[in-house]
Amino acid sequence: MDRTTFGRKTFNTQRNRLDRFVAPRDSFSETRRRRSWHAACDVQPINNDIWFGKNLKKKKYTKYLDKALDLESPDKSNSIKRMVQPWPCIPRKKTYLSSADSILDLPTYSYAIFPELLDWSNDNVLVAALGRNYHKWSWRSQSLISQGYAEYQIQCCKFDPRGELLLLGTYMKTVEIHNNVKSKKIDSNTCNCLEKDNRNCSITAVDWSPTGNSFATGCSWGAVTSFTRAAKLISWRHFVREAILLILIALSPNARYLAVTAVNTALVLLLTWPSLEMYSSIDSDWTIRTISWHPWRSALLGVGAVTDDLQARIALWDAPTCKVRDTSIGPKRYRLDAMLFSHRTGELVLSMWNSDRAILHPKACSQLVVMSDPDTMVDQWGEGRSGLDRVRTMVFSPDGTKLATATSDEDLIIWNFLPEDKKMKKTKCRFFSALPEYLDEAMQGYSLR
């Protein structure tokens, strides 16, 4: 069967029914389908999961009764600890992740070694890089609008903040800059690993500065480079003296710091931008999975990790003061895949999966979790036998109301993260003001009573 990038998909694709008296699964509502999978999940440890939908409703109702009856909550013992908000946030009052807006196809994405192959520009265009080609899909027209290609296989991609350029990190140490309108290469440069260390590398991570006047790259040999907007070299530093599979980099919102780490390592570096001088570092006994800057603070870095006993942890690192606060997230046996702060609400979005549940089902049964603090989950989706596979990367739409996730099952799912903005209504209507103005002119300012 021929598959096209950004082709329409459904969660429950199946062959046509031969028996016309048996209703297809798609005819049932999503809520009913999610309630019907109890047979394989009656195992006691899984049903006792505190993130299980039934237990979440009980917890929410308990809090409601405590507030209505003016009872003291058991959590009040830790009230002093929780008075300090770990990260700035305006949490939602309703849940919105119960439905997906669109489900599109990403052929061959499951074979990609590096996951950062998806981005969303400020002019509402999604890009997916697969192999040497990249494909652009317009949110407004809901269709594929253009395609482009790179000289080598693409490992990562990123739109500039202005939406004019597309940055591509590729194999053979090359970074390319493409014009977003024409989908053609206009500039390129290479990493200095070959000249300095006589090694060929791959560009595995890229990120733009907040102004779009410069960008950073990270390679598979642990080198970090800063470039101008025209791909001119600014600085180059080598921090890891061994081959690493995936390096992660992220520029702070105030454009002063560059966070650098490698997946499945324990060290996070903080460099000055754009000189790439060492500023600070943290070393722990965790396994680093992802990093993300909070968009509402000048330099508050979130570090997502997993401990040896499979406990997900989040460390919040305030770069100017070098203070680090870490806390556990959720129950044990949950592993962290991706993490992102919402620029609209400040909420923390996590993609996690339960290793125990993954043993029972062919899919890892990922959960998208939206948290306002380490102890409060305000929204979630993803329980069931046929649901969300592991999310490898995710990006927000420009207005922050949609969340696009790319899964190991080669699905691009666009979620309704928040309700769309209502159109501004005119507070003054010309139809009602025209008659009084005409009468005032006709009567030359006199008022007849």
UniProtKB/Swiss-Prot annotation:
Domain of life assignment: Eukaryota
Keywords: Cytoplasm, Repeat, WD repeat
Assigned GO CC terms: anaphase-promoting complex; cytoplasm
GO molecular function: anaphase-promoting complex binding; ubiquitin ligase activator activity
Main location: cytoplasm
Residue interval(s) of motif D-box: 386-397
Keyword Cytoplasm: yes
Gene Ontology biological-process annotations: anaphase-promoting complex-dependent catabolic process; positive regulation of anaphase-promoting complex-dependent catabolic process
UniProt function note: Controls wing pigmentation patterning by regulating scale cell development, thereby playing a key role in mimicry and crypsis. Probably acts as an activator of the anaphase promoting complex/cyclosome (APC/C) that promotes the ubiquitin ligase activity and substrate specificity of the APC/C.
Protein name: Protein cortex
Gene name as annotated: cort
